[in-house]
């Protein structure tokens, strides 16, 4: 301190805050001026002063010191709003999943960064001496990021693999985390724990490998005599001065440096601070320096090529173990910096664009000449400013000036009004984040079930020519058409046909697969035949056992056009039989005076197509006999003879026959309305037994009475029956009968209440309780019914020319469904009388079965359907051409083995109510899709819940626009007859005339011509897209008549907007919220199937946006299930920028693993490089120079990659250390197989300098390949087998060395340590006795020639600097090959 006191009058007092960086510079100046000893004495005094001040200040930290930033609330709301809009765009198909992920991450990262930037001004304004604020900028272990997590928001987290979790933690640690945020926080914080434990060991292992590969590198000579060097230049300001200084200080010049004609530095002069400053000042020529790359030695290094020692400002001493120092210098920062993640808690620290926000409300103004319009990387319109742009925001009382840096995006227009804190500009990230990105694959999974379609061309990837992998050539949408898929390898392919109607929610198809998909159709056929034909066809046969086959339940209505016994009527080989009846199915037109509505008649046929005697063929429920309320039935007990005697009854599974108890034919019969409730035993009843209640009285907690009257409660079998009798209660003196019906005009004439009755009455005698003797009489109104003969089902089935035999008879029977004399019915909808059509044939025939099937005939586009019934002598007489399953192998658990077909509700109706009926949400249509596997078949069930209807459009004024747009091309094929439901079967999947229908001569016109079809179709203006992709226009093509079974194809859709005159074609896909009418946008996305003039219906579809190069999985029209892989994107993804991700990159570079994907246009770059080399150097030099430049370029590129990782973390490592490592992994070449076989064995690894010397000695061309060895392989390919054996694979290395007879000259450190010898470094280093001046003259002459050759090489390599600066930068990924940057 005496020196300081003496010099105080001449020194200036600086009142300035010193941070860590300034302290480093101060210590460096102390060492330069006063030396190390005196500097340590000064720093001890500074340390003591710091502890004394900290004790006096006594800074503490409490929870009240954590001040939350006020602007956080609306910043988070703004980010949530942006995320919501982004989610909407993704749902509409405007943004694909990768864009959504990337933009979401950028939104939240920008919000978190803005909060972090606002934190410091907030502390300075509100509490500048806040302990948290003081600690965060003290330079100790901790930074602003941790304080930001305490008082701002924790933000985005990184998982242990370094990938971002796109769900941000919006809370900070002061507010506390929710459960979800806590789980994500633990997941991210686990990253710090993992890094501390595992990555530390990785860094230690990296240090061991680095030391292993360079442990023998020792400074052994002063000068190796090389004239080569590497050129370094500031590149006209492209290289930062700081990096330029770090690169040059401590190096040795390889050539003289001239400014004009004056030499300012000579060869072999070391570069200090003063010389570097002169280089920067004068902007001298590119400077050639000596590096370890240019040293001529193989196993050591010279003083001048290494340069100054890092410890002191002088050339490195001889005997210095610079290799071990280099390995430690690279490995040690990795070990230390691994711990950084633990302190940041796994928070993502990436580089994205920063936002500039408006300071206040006002009008923004800027010079429009300095900007030009463009789009941001997300496609949003913006202005790009090429230089600094000053923006003024004029509010009412103040004008704010904001400076926008160059290459930024301005997101507002000139003279636009902006609100406070609105984002007005986006600043590009200052540091390039390319080194923090990697190419990854992102799989997109389907979130719905249906069929996949696309509206663009795709092509197969060449490596998957026969697979289902497709590449998209351009941006397009993938669509999932919604539906309920079902797949099975069992026999339903012969049961369910295309266009079948079924209950959409009854089959076990809904997300339930057959449990044994390995069962093939052949196994099912074998099982069915063996069980079906095993017994004799007599009464008492056992029912075939199908329990081993998997089951599928089916309830409700199913519309089966082709029963399985005939397999679509396509392959019968039976002989001609006359026991056949064919019934034409008439289409009943609306508007006729008819008693039978067409929707009430159903044909009932078993699923296997087999009918027994007295089977019900069709039935009709008369609406006049339907009651909507519960009640009692009453009729006389007089019974008629049954149609079928009980002893003649043959019971067969699933076929309904007439039981005698059904055959009560009474006329009239009566219905007594009574309200009946069946309640559970645990129900709380709120009315009493024998009480009288009014209408709408609370009975239980959730039930009310519909009528008023007497309440009777009965308990039966764990259930309570509550009956409410409406009517009058009388207490007569005596009663004769317990039950009595009084007709109109009846009653006792001597009664006081005598009155001529107009209606039927029902009198019932009742007791108040079981033990009471007194009776009372309940008088109830009665509804009488008479059965009429007006229902004539025979009119629907006329006997005509098609009937070949009188053996088969059809009888019409009316019967009452409820047979007890008094039966209580509590259903809400009761059918009292049913009319049925019974099939019968002669008793003397021994035939017990008849087979029924539907036949469809087309002539000139006209379609007609028939029901055909054949008597079958035995099942063997029916054989199939393809050995198909003659019956179904499915058992229905509810015992109902029949299809209810309603062919009379036809599409010929012009009623809109019928259209609504066909869109019943409980109905669905089966669509068959062909699988690549021929043994199985895929079905998709399309219900009306997958469709939506729009309209009617009342404001459509010109329907001719629609007509004209369709008439231009009435039959439009869509993707080569692939319809909207994929590669389905055609509407009729069998040959219509492959078998003989009848032997009688008939006139086809009698059955196939409908006179009033033209009139009907002129009323219906709609356009239909069918399975084959053809467009049917019944309005203009009246000869096309749709099959009446295709009820479900009433999916109508037309997209029409009068304002924009939008005309949408059939089959087109529409995204959500497309304008189709004046009422507003449409709500769902889907595909156009059918269109009408005034209303439209679409089939719902889910769009997915895909970019060019994306991989599509699956075929067009293929069924996809929820969770299936839909498309794969390849994109660049940001990785977190901490050292845990950088350290593996260092390891990848030094182990020479590929870390960057190969450029797409690599071939063009190589072609350009070859042309450039040939043009400048000429043909003879091309290969020789090319091999040399390849090694030089690869070395410089590796150094730059390693430095880039460390510099991104603020770690400074001298290039010398990395160069020593890289020299070792690039100093080997691989001997080619065609040359040098007489000197080296093919494929042998030899040193690069050794190969060159051998070539010069042999005076012949040397063929070798430059190879990059990783540090592990380089450690295993040294001159010392003892060093290799001590590293790894000891037994193999020693055995191989013994077989080859290798000699270890013990030149390295490790082998001497193993054998206990003196290590050749430091005090154990021996100065070389032979210097170059002792070499004889003739050898000196050879050396001189060699030097001349090297001088020529140097001229070619390093004096054509324009060539290197231009060509190398254009033809290689790394453009800084000459700068170590």
UniProtKB/Swiss-Prot annotation:
GO BP of this protein: DNA-templated transcription
Family designation: Belongs to the RNA polymerase beta' chain family. RpoC2 subfamily.
Entry annotated with the keyword Magnesium: no
Manner of cofactor binding, per the entry note: Binds 1 Zn(2+) ion per subunit.
EC number: 2.7.7.6
Disulfide linkage: none
Record carries keyword Nucleotidyltransferase: yes
CDD domains registered for this protein in UniProt: RNAP_beta'_C (cd02655)
Binding site for Zn(2+): 224, 295, 302, 305
Listed cofactors: Zn(2+)
Cellular component terms (Gene Ontology): chloroplast; DNA-directed RNA polymerase complex; mitochondrion
Protein name: DNA-directed RNA polymerase subunit beta''
Subunit organization: In plastids the minimal PEP RNA polymerase catalytic core is composed of four subunits: alpha, beta, beta', and beta''. When a (nuclear-encoded) sigma factor is associated with the core the holoenzyme is formed, which can initiate transcription.
Main location, first listed in the record: plastid
MF terms (GO), sorted A to Z: DNA binding; DNA-directed RNA polymerase activity; zinc ion binding
Positions of transmembrane segments: none
Domain of life according to the entry: Eukaryota
Purpose of the protein: DNA-dependent RNA polymerase catalyzes the transcription of DNA into RNA using the four ribonucleoside triphosphates as substrates.
Subcellular location: Plastid, Chloroplast
């Amino acid at each position: 301190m005496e020196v300081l006191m003496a010099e105080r009058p001449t020194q200036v007092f600086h009142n300035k805050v010193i941070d860590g960086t300034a302290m480093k510079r101060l210590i460096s100046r102390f060492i330069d001026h006063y030396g190390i000893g005196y500097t340590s004495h000064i720093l001890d005094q500074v340390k003591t002063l710091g502890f004394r001040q900290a004790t006096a200040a006594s800074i503490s930290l409490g929870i009240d010191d954590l001040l939350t930033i006020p602007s956080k609330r609306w910043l988070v709301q703004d980010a949530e709003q942006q995320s919501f809009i982004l989610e909407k765009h993704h749902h509409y198909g405007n943004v694909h999943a990768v864009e959504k992920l990337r933009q979401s991450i950028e939104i939240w990262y920008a919000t978190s960064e803005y909060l972090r930037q606002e934190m410091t001004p907030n502390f300075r304004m509100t509490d500048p001496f806040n302990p948290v604020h003081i600690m965060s900028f003290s330079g100790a272990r901790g930074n602003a990021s941790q304080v930001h997590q305490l008082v701002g928001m924790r933000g985005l987290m990184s998982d242990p693999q370094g990938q971002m979790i796109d769900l941000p933690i919006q809370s900070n640690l002061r507010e506390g985390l929710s459960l979800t945020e806590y789980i994500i926080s633990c997941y991210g914080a686990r990253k710090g724990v993992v890094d501390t434990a595992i990555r530390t060991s990785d860094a230690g292992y990296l240090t061991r490998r680095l030391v292993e590969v360079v442990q023998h590198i020792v400074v052994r000579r002063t000068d190796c005599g090389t004239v080569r060097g590497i050129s370094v230049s500031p590149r006209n300001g492209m290289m930062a001065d700081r990096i330029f200084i770090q690169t040059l200080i401590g190096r040795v010049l390889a050539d003289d440096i001239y400014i004009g004609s004056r030499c300012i530095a000579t060869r072999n002069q070391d570069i200090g601070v003063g010389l570097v400053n002169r280089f920067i000042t004068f902007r001298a020529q590119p400077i050639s320096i000596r590096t370890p790359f240019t040293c001529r030695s193989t196993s050591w290094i010279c003083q001048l090529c290494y340069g100054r020692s890092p410890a002191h400002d002088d050339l490195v001493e001889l005997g210095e173990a610079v290799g071990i120092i280099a390995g430690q210098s690279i490995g040690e920062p990795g070990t230390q910096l691994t711990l950084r993640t633990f302190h940041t808690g796994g928070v993502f620290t990436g580089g994205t664009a920063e936002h500039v926000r408006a300071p206040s409300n006002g009008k923004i103004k800027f010079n429009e000449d300095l900007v030009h319009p463009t789009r941001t990387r997300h496609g949003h319109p913006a202005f790009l400013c090429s230089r600094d742009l000053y923006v003024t925001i004029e509010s009412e009382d103040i004008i704010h000036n904001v400076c926008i840096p160059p290459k930024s995006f301005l997101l507002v227009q000139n003279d636009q009004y902006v609100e406070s804190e609105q984002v007005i500009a986006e600043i590009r990230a200052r540091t390039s984040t390319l080194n923090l990105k990697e190419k990854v694959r992102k799989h997109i999974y389907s979130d719905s079930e249906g069929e996949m379609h696309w509206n663009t061309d795709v092509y197969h990837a060449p490596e998957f020519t026969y697979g289902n992998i497709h590449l998209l050539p351009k941006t397009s949408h993938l669509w999932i058409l919604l539906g309920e898929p079902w797949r099975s390898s069992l026999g339903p392919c012969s049961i369910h046909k295309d266009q079948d109607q079924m209950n959409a929610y009854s089959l076990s198809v809904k997300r339930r697969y057959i449990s044994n998909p390995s069962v093939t159709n052949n196994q099912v056929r074998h099982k069915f035949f063996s069980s079906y034909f095993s017994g004799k066809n007599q009464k008492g046969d056992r029912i075939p056992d199908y329990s081993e086959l998997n089951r599928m339940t089916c309830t409700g209505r199913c519309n089966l056009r082709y029963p399985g016994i005939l397999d679509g009527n396509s392959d019968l080989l039976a002989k001609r039989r006359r026991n056949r009846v064919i019934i034409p199915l008439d289409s009943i037109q609306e508007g006729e005076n008819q008693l039978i509505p067409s929707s009430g008649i159903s044909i009932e046929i078993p699923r296997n197509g087999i009918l027994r005697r007295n089977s019900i063929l069709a039935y009709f429920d008369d609406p006049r006999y339907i009651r909507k309320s519960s009640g009692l039935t009453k009729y006389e007990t007089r019974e008629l003879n049954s149609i079928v005697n009980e002893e003649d009854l043959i019971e067969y599974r699933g076929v309904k026959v007439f039981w005698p108890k059904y055959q009560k034919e009474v006329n009239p019969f009566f219905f007594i309305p009574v309200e009946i409730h069946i309640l559970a035993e645990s129900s709380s009843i709120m009315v009493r037994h024998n009480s009288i209640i009014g209408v709408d009285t609370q009975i239980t907690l959730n039930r009310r009475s519909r009528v008023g009257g007497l309440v009777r409660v009965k308990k039966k079998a764990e259930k309570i029956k509550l009956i409410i009798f409406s009517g009058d209660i009388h207490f007569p003196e005596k009663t004769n009968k317990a039950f009595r019906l009084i007709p109109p005009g009846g009653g006792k004439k001597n009664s006081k209440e005598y009155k001529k009755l107009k209606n039927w009455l029902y009198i019932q005698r009742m007791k108040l309780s079981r033990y009471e003797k007194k009776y009372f009489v309940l008088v109830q109104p009665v509804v009488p019914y008479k059965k009429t003969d007006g229902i004539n089902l025979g009119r629907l089935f006329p006997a005509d020319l098609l009937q070949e035999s009188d053996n088969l008879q059809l009888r019409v029977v009316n019967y009452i469904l409820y047979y007890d004399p008094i039966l209580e019915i509590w259903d809400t909808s009761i059918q009292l009388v049913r009319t049925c059509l019974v099939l019968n044939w002669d008793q003397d025939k021994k035939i017990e079965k008849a087979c029924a099937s539907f036949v469809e005939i087309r002539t000139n586009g006209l379609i007609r359907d028939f029901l055909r019934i054949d008597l079958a002598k035995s099942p063997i007489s029916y054989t199939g051409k393809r050995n198909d399953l003659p019956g179904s192998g499915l058992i229905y658990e509810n015992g109902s083995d029949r299809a209810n077909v309603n062919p009379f509700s036809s599409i010929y109706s012009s009623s809109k109510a019928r259209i609504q009926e066909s869109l019943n949400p409980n109905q669905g249509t089966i669509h068959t899709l062909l699988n690549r596997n021929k043994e199985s078949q895929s079905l998709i069930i399309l219900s009306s819940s997958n469709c939506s209807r729009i309209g009617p459009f009342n404001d459509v004024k010109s329907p001719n626009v629609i007509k004209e747009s369709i008439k231009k091309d009435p039959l439009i094929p869509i993707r080569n007859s692939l319809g909207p439901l994929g590669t389905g079967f055609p509407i009729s999947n069998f040959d219509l005339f492959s078998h003989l229908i009848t032997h009688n001569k008939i006139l086809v016109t009698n059955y196939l011509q409908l006179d009033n079809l033209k009139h009907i179709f002129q009323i219906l203006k709609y356009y239909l897209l069918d399975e084959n992709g053809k467009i049917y226009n019944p309005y203009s093509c009246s000869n096309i008549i749709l099959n009446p079974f295709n009820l479900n194809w009433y999916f109508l859709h037309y997209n029409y907007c009068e304002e924009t005159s939008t005309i949408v074609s059939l089959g087109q896909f529409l995204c959500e919220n497309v304008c189709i009418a004046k009422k507003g946008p449409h709500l769902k996305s889907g595909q156009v199937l059918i269109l009408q003039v005034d209303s439209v219906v679409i089939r719902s579809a889910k769009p997915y946006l895909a970019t060019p190069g994306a991989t599509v999985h699956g075929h067009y029209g293929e069924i996809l299930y929820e969770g299936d892989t839909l498309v794969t994107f390849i994109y660049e993804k940001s990785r977190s920028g901490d050292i845990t991700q950088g350290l593996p990159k260092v390891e990848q570079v030094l182990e020479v693993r590929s870390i960057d994907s190969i450029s797409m246009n690599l071939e063009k770059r190589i072609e350009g490089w070859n042309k450039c080399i040939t043009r400048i150097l000429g043909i003879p030099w091309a290969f020789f120079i090319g091999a040399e430049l390849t090694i030089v370029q690869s070395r410089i590129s590796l150094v730059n990659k390693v430095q880039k990782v460390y510099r991104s973390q603020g770690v400074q490592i001298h290039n010398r250390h990395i160069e020593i490592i890289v020299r070792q992994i690039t100093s080997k070449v691989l001997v080619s197989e065609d040359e040098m076989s007489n000197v080296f064995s093919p494929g042998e690894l030899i040193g690069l300098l050794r190969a060159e010397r051998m070539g010069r000695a042999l005076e012949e061309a040397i063929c070798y390949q430059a190879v990059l060895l990783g540090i592990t392989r380089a450690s295993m390919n040294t001159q010392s087998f003892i060093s290799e054996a001590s590293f790894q694979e000891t037994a193999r290395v020693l055995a191989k060395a013994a077989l080859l007879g290798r000699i270890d000259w013990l030149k390295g450190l490790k082998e001497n340590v193993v054998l206990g010898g003196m290590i050749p470094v430091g005090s154990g280093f021996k100065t070389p006795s032979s210097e170059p001046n002792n070499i004889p003259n003739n050898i000196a002459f050879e050396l001189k020639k060699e030097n001349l050759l090297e001088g020529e090489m140097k001229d070619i390599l390093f004096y054509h600097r324009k060539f290197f600066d231009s060509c190398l930068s254009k033809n290689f990924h790394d453009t800084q090959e000459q700068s170590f940057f």
